[in-house]
Design a protein with these regions (language model features):
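Conserved Class I S-adenosyl-L-methionine-dependent methyltransferase catalytic core
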Residues: 13-175
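Eukaryotic partner-binding/assembly regions in large regulatory complexes
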Residues: 1-17
């Protein structure tokens, strides 16, 4: 189907994206500016927690069950207390559901972290938070802004797509 034949769908998509952007702007309008800045500044913690849950493949191990943090930790080879804190953080931001104190299950959001789901975004979470992608942001972003050199190039000595050519495991994750 050509773009011209699909003009209606393109317009609907553009409207949906505009509506989504408007929805995302609501928190900034409803909360005091200092609180919103702190929220943005600490978003890394949420992203990192999500990354660890994806690395551990928590959603797949939970499946359709409700499991205590201790039971889940046993399946994952993790500390029950530490996993419980991680799961509570993720439940607080809506990624999993805490059905009773320290008992968790998947919800509509975490369903897309199942490694065997065809619509899973787990690989994308792993990619975005990988050391390869994190280093440019944490170690080279300021230098890149000052010099005009891409932070990825500063961190890895080559452009992203050249890097992909030389690192097959990362290329598979990227694809």
């Amino acid at each position: 189907m050509t773009l011209q034949m699909n003009t209606g769908a393109v317009r609907r998509f553009a409207k949906a994206m505009k509506f989504g952007a408007w929805l995302q702007s609501i928190p900034g309008k409803l909360m005091p500016a200092p609180f919103r800045l702190v929220q943005i500044g600490s978003a890394y913690w949420q992203s990192r927690a999500l990354f660890v849950a994806a690395r551990l493949d928590v959603a797949t191990h939970l499946g359709e069950e409700c499991l205590s943090a201790a039971e889940l930790a046993g399946r994952l080879g993790a500390s029950g207390d530490a996993l419980g804190r991680l799961m509570r953080l993720l439940a607080a931001i809506g990624v999993f559901e805490e059905t009773a104190p320290m008992v968790f299950r998947n919800n509509k959001l975490s369903h897309y972290l199942h490694s065997d789901d065809p619509h899973s975004v787990r690989a994308m979470i792993l990619l975005h938070n990988s050391e390869t992608m994190s280093r440019p942001w944490f170690e080279q972003l300021e230098a890149g802004i000052r010099s005009g050199t891409p932070p990825f190039l500063l961190a890895h000595g080559e452009e992203l797509f050249d890097y992909l050519d030389h690192h097959a495991d990362f290329d598979r994750l990227f694809s």
